[in-house]
Amino acid sequence: MRLCAIILAALAATALDCSAGAHAAPAAAEVRLAHLTITSRGSGSPVVLIPGLASPAAVFDDVATRIGKDHRLILVQVNGFAGTRPSSGPVDNLLPAAVDELAGWLDANHIEKPAVIGHSMGGLMAMMLAKSHPEAAGRLLIVDSLPFYGMLFGSSATPDTIRPLVEQMRAGLVNGTSPVQVPPHMSNTDTGKAKILAWLKASDPKTVGEALVEDATTDFRPDLPALSAVRVTVLYAVPNPEMKAMADALYREAYKSLPNAKLVPVSNSEHFIMLDQPAQFDEAVEAFLR
């Protein structure tokens, strides 16, 4: 199935006061933590933006410019992705540690219940944040992300059954040569493909490999009901009209235990929706923030 190839290629490719009201305008600032680099700028109701595997915060540049005049933006980047210096410590248990680190930063800066936007792996991190730290996520916009990628292998797939495959992908990343072309189905534009390839080439293979394994083998579906009190919107890519029914069915099944989630298809887009369909993405973000 081509839809499976899209998402598996994404994995293999990287083979305020405390209310939602007015906020004092903080100075633009960047802080490097153990696992994350966080940049905060602007004022207004806070919005956290979390990119995906091997991606920088810059993947959100266009929409950040659009919404930045009305919101305090908290731009998150995993250290080791897209040119940032990797962590000097162990990278195991990366995603839970990064989520806890983000929650701690938000708490230290007296930011409660921000809107959180996460793409791909960043979508999983957003859901983990909302479950583990309810005060750190007021609403979620999940962008082309499934709660368990293993479901693409069939209804009997589990984290244990897909682990050997993703461990092979990790080994290929760590021991292989630098990629020379962007993997398929990441973007449908030459500009988007060039950006994605540059980010991938600039990423630390060890960090990306660990994040890949954790992302692919985390099954968040049993935890989705814990988000029932959270406003959740899920955007998902539909590369062509022939794939719409398949994509619709996949996302309905994936999020069936979260009936309050609003599922929104984005037509004529590959995995990086914000690069392929910036107008549709901007409209979806603005609707989410209203």
What kind of region is each of these model predictions?
Residues 34, 39-86:
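Conserved HGGG/HGGXW glycine-rich cap/lid loop of the alpha/beta-hydrolase fold
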Residues 1-47, 68-72, 93, 112, ...:
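Alpha/beta-hydrolase fold catalytic core
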Residues 131, 138-171:
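Flexible "cap/lid" loop of the alpha/beta hydrolase fold
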